[in-house]
C-alpha cells in the first residue's frame, strides 16, 4: 500500500515538474499576457490594459522601428517598461525634451535601441537614460486583449517618425 501511494506521489511530482518546465519555456520563449501600467504609452495603451507580448521576434525576426516592446528598465532592473522602438543601431534620432523646448540629435550605437513612450510629456524613456542594450528587450507587444472595446492589433505611433536627416 505504501508503495502504491509513493508511486502515485512521485508520478504526480514528475508531471508537475514537466508541466512547469513546459509553461516556463512557453512564457520565456513564445510569449505571454502582460498588464501595462502607467501613462507613458497613452493613447495607444492605457493604464492597466492587458496585452499579448510575443518573445520570438527578439530571437528570430528582429525588432523593427515602430514596434512596442517590453524591456527591463535600465534604471530599475526589477521592473519592466513598455515603450515604442523609435531607433535601431546606427540611427540618428531627433528627440525633444518633455517640455518640447529643446531638440537634440542622438546616435544609437551598435547593439542598442532607442525607446520612447507615445505620451511624450509623461514618459521616462531613452530621452532620459539614453539608448538601451538590445539584450534588455523581453518581447514585442502587438495585440490588445483588455479592455474588450479595444480588442485587436495595436495602431501606429501618434507621434510619427522622428529621424535626423544628417
From Swiss-Prot:
Gene Ontology CC entries for this record: mitochondrial inner membrane; mitochondrion
Active-site feature positions: 40, 83
InterPro entries per UniProt: LexA/Signal_pep-like_sf, Mito_IMP1_subunit, Pept_S26A_signal_pept_1, Peptidase_S26
Pfam family, one: Peptidase_S26
Subcellular location: Mitochondrion inner membrane
Record GO biological process: signal peptide processing
Subunit structure: Heterodimer of 2 subunits, IMMPL1 and IMMPL2.
EC category: hydrolase
Function: Catalyzes the removal of transit peptides required for the targeting of proteins from the mitochondrial matrix, across the inner membrane, into the inter-membrane space. Known to process the nuclear encoded protein DIABLO.
Species this chain originates from: Mus musculus (Mouse)
E.C. no: 3.4.21.-
One GO MF term: serine-type endopeptidase activity
Family per similarity comment: Belongs to the peptidase S26 family. IMP1 subfamily.
Coiled-coil intervals: none
Protein name as catalogued: Mitochondrial inner membrane protease subunit 1
UniProt keyword annotations, A-Z: Hydrolase, Membrane, Mitochondrion, Mitochondrion inner membrane, Protease
